[in-house]
Structure formats: structure tokens, C-alpha cells
């Protein structure tokens, strides 16, 4: 999604 790659999980 938006922060996919920045956070350890995309959008749960």
C-alpha cells in the first residue's frame, strides 16, 4: 500500500 517497504508490515 502506501508505506509498503518503509514499515515491517504494509497495511494490516
From Swiss-Prot:
Transmembrane annotation, as ranges: none
Compartment(s) where it occurs, according to its Swiss-Prot or TrEMBL record: Secreted
Subcellular location, principal: secreted
GO cellular component terms, A-Z: extracellular region
Superkingdom, natural source: Eukaryota
Valine amide, modified sites: 12
GO terms (BP aspect): neuropeptide signaling pathway
InterPro entries: Periviscerokinin
Keyword tags: Amidation, Neuropeptide, Secreted
Coiled-coil ranges per UniProt: none
Cited function: Mediates visceral muscle contractile activity (myotropic activity).
Family named by the database record: Belongs to the periviscerokinin family.
Protein name: CAPA-Periviscerokinin-1
Amino acid at each position: 500500500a502506501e508505506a509498503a517497504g518503509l514499515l515491517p508490515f504494509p497495511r494490516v
